């Protein structure tokens, strides 16, 4: 079918618009790089992309190279994130290149919408030495580079070969070479740079992940002779030069950060950003083995703070931040103030000398001239009875059209994309992680930095609601589909304080709601430049106000309640109809956005408390959620803040009963879950073809068996860009729902 391909192409297009606006700030000294793809029972990529602390996420690994791969193609391993299906060459030979990575295909657009930079890592722990990966000749290097560019780079009509991540485009490649290094990798870098130059629409990056010993036998030469953007040094595994060793005695340690700075400054990577590589936890850094608390890998937060402070200030031109292996272990390392990676991000921001100091004092309201965009909907519903029969409620689904290409977009969360799919789990094994969210709806003191990379959130609503536009994101034009739903857009003046009003009508269980007109919602999109910000939360908690350059920030919602008993039409249990107007604060690319909305909700008083100013009910089908996000336009530098806003409650798709699989030890075959993978969707390559030159031939899709067949486990590589065994949305587009609706009509 063409429908899934149309949807994915649309998501990829919107992700491109957003990612060009929120690309990683390569000049920042506060970036956090996180490896993902090899964690034991790890969560989906989208889970980590919705956490503000991750700036660059490196997916691992392409762990088999063409010179060693079946059919002369590379092979991949992403743990539990792909099914067992692989591509087949035109000659009929099965390869090790995974073809059924549907979760990753769905999640990359979410990451791009959140401003994340997504890179793909090559190498990892070389389990079988030269049998695993190496580049034997210059011709092999060029072939491999072109294969990667065609398979994971921008979509090209000239390429009809494999696209493991669909139409998604990754932002660059990471070299985590831990065996057989040295010759020929410089030719890969040269060829990739040449390919990057053919696409001026976006920025691409190259990184390397050497171990801390200098010179590194596998990557030292290529780092010196070829230009890399990022160097992720693994300051663990090797005790003599580890970060842990530095923390014990900085003056006598063999910590090599200084030596690495001098090394890269003498070569082609002189402008590269250097990262301190750390492990995310001192337990379970390897899935099948635990390290003790006094091991020589894990660095406690107080020591990490000292290390960051010492080297960030010493080498500002080359210091880039911290690399963490890996997303899962960091997420499971629950500290008092959040996960390990979120604390590392906080330490980086705190130690950044460019971060302005914050002060608190009462904010005076000053009239400020600003233009805001107000979008209104008028929705008329018909009679509703207690028998749950709804006679033709007319909710319009507006036709959505995007304006011509601009440098902006509205990023909103869609339950069909953000929620991890509960379709049959792949038969591979790797990863579980619980996300870090700040669930306290209070005002947080702002911490700022110069980075431009973080999550942007706006509200989303069910069908029939309007979205106001934000400067810096694509303009969305809505057209009513039915005559009884109207959409207007007008411009108002300065923002004003708004109240939350709930009108209650208590009736018996058999009641009529006739000709009810609800206006939903008014969005006031107001860009605000501030040094300190007070956020209003829907929970009604008191917020402190800080100096804000004369900008008025809405206070907590207020509420007036009117109870009007209606004449019962039939005895029964009473229900309550509440008309709620509430205001909450969100963040858009241009600053703080105040969102005011009115909606109707019906509930049973016996089971649900009466709404109050401190406890406004969420819109129907939605719930309040609180996240920690970063505003890059709220002050002279970026600001971390806590915002609360409504999100759609996801509906879980029906799936067959699943039998958990057994995780095998590394390198051993495993047993499947008993649930076979689905057939490969139509947006992946089809029939074989023939290509000439240095490009690989087009593959034939390997289709997994139908239900009832047996799958198999794919053992994660487990190490790599941060290998620890050998010493070596948030936010998607709201218009997606409308596009799907109209396509299906």
From Swiss-Prot:
This is Probable endochitinase ARB_07371. It comes from Arthroderma benhamiae (strain ATCC MYA-4681 / CBS 112371). Residues 357-372 have a biased composition (Low complexity). It is a lipid-anchor; GPI-anchor. CDD domains: GH18_hevamine_XipI_class_III. GPI-anchored chitinase involved in the degradation of chitin, a component of the cell walls of fungi and exoskeletal elements of some animals (including worms and arthropods). Required to reshape the cell wall at the sites where cell wall remodeling and/or cell wall maturation actively take place such as sites of conidia formation. It holds the Pfam family Glyco_hydro_18. The lineage of its organism: Eukaryota, Fungi, Dikarya, Ascomycota, Pezizomycotina. Residues 30-351 form the GH18 domain. Residues 351-372, 395-446, 651-715 are annotated as: Disordered. Its EC number is 3.2.1.14. One of its GO terms (cellular component) is extracellular region. Glycans are attached at residues 438, 484. PANTHER family: ENDOCHITINASE, ENDOCHITINASE A. It comes from the Eukaryota. InterPro entries: Cts1-like, Glyco_hydro18_cat, Glyco_hydro_18_chit_AS, Glycoside_hydrolase_SF, Glycosyl_Hydrlase18_Chitinase. Belongs to the glycosyl hydrolase 18 family. Chitinase class III subfamily. Residues 1-23 form the signal peptide. It catalyses: Random endo-hydrolysis of N-acetyl-beta-D-glucosaminide (1->4)-beta-linkages in chitin and chitodextrins. Residues 721-745 form a propeptide.
